[in-house]
Amino acid sequence: FFEKESCWVRVDMTDAFCSQLRKKIMASAASLQIPLIDHAVFACSEGPRFESAAEVKMYQMLGADLVGTPVVPEIILAREAGMCYSAIAAIMNLGCGMVESVAHDDMTKYYRSCGAQEKVEKIVRETIRTFVDDRTCRCAGAALEGVAGRFPAWYLEETEP
């Protein structure tokens, strides 16, 4: 952002998700006895649409554990804004080429019938309930670490104490 003011930012996406927030989410899930997998590789495709069988196969070959359309660009915008960000990905379909067909209605019905929606809501509520802002992560400074050029005058005026 800030491109027309001779400043742009390239945020480091090495650790895109906040590890501290992820730990809090994992602790909340554990306290509720809701199993979660701590780490996975998410491949984002352009949506809203389902991936083709060839895309699913390609992402598998590249090492993806999950494929979907959410998370990007949200994670990038959160990094640029200096926000802690994490995601809970509920598996709702196996993907084209892994099952005979994929339909949005089937996916939505499964999400509700298997209890995923309620589980995600419980985890989010518990994370908020037990949240303490004790962050020592680098999320807040992510954008500042990637600055090239000069900040525009309006930005400096808005951020002065």
Q: Each predicted region: which residue ranges?
A:
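Glycine-rich phosphate- or other oxyanion-binding loops that anchor nucleotides, phosphorylated ligands
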Residues: F1-V99, M107-C114, E118, V124-V132, ...
